[in-house]
């Protein structure tokens, strides 16, 4: 193998691949990136037993095709230090030489045949994603998921495919809150009418870096493969049964309040400077915010005027986690939001105002949250 490649193109590709390397054991083949030159393309692969990525860049010139491997971390360390001009990569015996002008490096290779093959699946479900709504849903629900949850099933995001109605439900929870959305008019091809899979949060975070729109998603129930023109990504799925979240959602709410999103965000941020929990009081023409701190005498208070007034006879009090409330508001694509409540001790719902239009490219997220006991 002997090629010339753009320094910037190679460095960008290597940065994407770092998350897929085994950096603890340099003797493992999983610490290496697999390189293969085919015609005018350099294909790069990195994988451990759970997750993997294959990408390619165009070569500037290709004198000889071939394969090789190289320690992924050291490869990036070298390339990032070089100047912004073409780089020569050449395999010699059991080493890979890296050259640019008067600088040269040589790193040992492993046997490329020992590199694990990328999986080929027989999909039970597949979709073509031509707009950013799915990635938008992933991005907004990701903060709710605990990667280290003691319940394995909850350490990922649920994707629930309904072929009959052509809908995809996306759900995440940490048991204290639950965020969900239903994406409609999805072209689902499935061997079963209803099928679901749980993507690990680690995979979810990498998907957000690699994909936006114009990609395919396929799953055989054990693995998921996501692919676009530049990248092929695979991940093992979480094996388990996700809780039936529909049973958790209240059938109805006693009260429903339409409120200003930005005013609430500013007020919560002010009070959360002293405490992570806040007492929210809703009155006919005001929303009052007060920090809750049982250990110190520190307090923070602020209020927001509600111009249109609320249909409420007496003050309604609610204890909320400031961080959770802010993340729920940040997931909304409208300037107003709806707060749906029952008793102060019961879960409450935050969702977008149905009267306000938003971009059809955005996912409409609803978040059910447990209150803080006052």
UniProtKB/Swiss-Prot annotation:
Q: Could you tell me one molecular function GO term of this UniProt entry? A: DNA binding
Q: Does the keyword Ligase apply?
A: no
Which GO cellular component does the record give, naming just one? cytoplasm
CDD domains for this protein:
beta_clamp (cd00140)
Q: Quote the subcellular location field of this record.
A: Cytoplasm
Carries keyword Oxidoreductase? no
Q: Which InterPro entries does the protein's record reference?
A: DNA_clamp_sf, DNA_polIII_beta, DNA_polIII_beta_C, DNA_polIII_beta_cen, DNA_polIII_beta_N
Output the superkingdom of the source species: Bacteria
Instruction: Tell me the SUPFAM superfamilies matching this sequence.
Output: DNA clamp
**Annotated keywords:** Cytoplasm, DNA replication, DNA-binding, DNA-directed DNA polymerase, Nucleotidyltransferase, Transferase
Which is one Pfam family of this protein? DNA_pol3_beta_3
Some GO term, biological process aspect, for this entry: which one?
A: DNA strand elongation involved in DNA replication
- Its family? Belongs to the beta sliding clamp family.
Note the subunit structure: Forms a ring-shaped head-to-tail homodimer around DNA which binds and tethers DNA polymerases and other proteins to the DNA. The DNA replisome complex has a single clamp-loading complex (3 tau and 1 each of delta, delta', psi and chi subunits) which binds 3 Pol III cores (1 core on the leading strand and 2 on the lagging strand) each with a beta sliding clamp dimer. Additional proteins in the replisome are other copies of gamma, psi and chi, Ssb, DNA helicase and RNA primase.
Its biological purpose: Confers DNA tethering and processivity to DNA polymerases and other proteins. Acts as a clamp, forming a ring around DNA (a reaction catalyzed by the clamp-loading complex) which diffuses in an ATP-independent manner freely and bidirectionally along dsDNA. Initially characterized for its ability to contact the catalytic subunit of DNA polymerase III (Pol III), a complex, multichain enzyme responsible for most of the replicative synthesis in bacteria; Pol III exhibits 3'-5' exonuclease proofreading activity.
Its protein name is: Beta sliding clamp
The species is Helicobacter pylori (strain ATCC 700392 / 26695) (Campylobacter pylori)
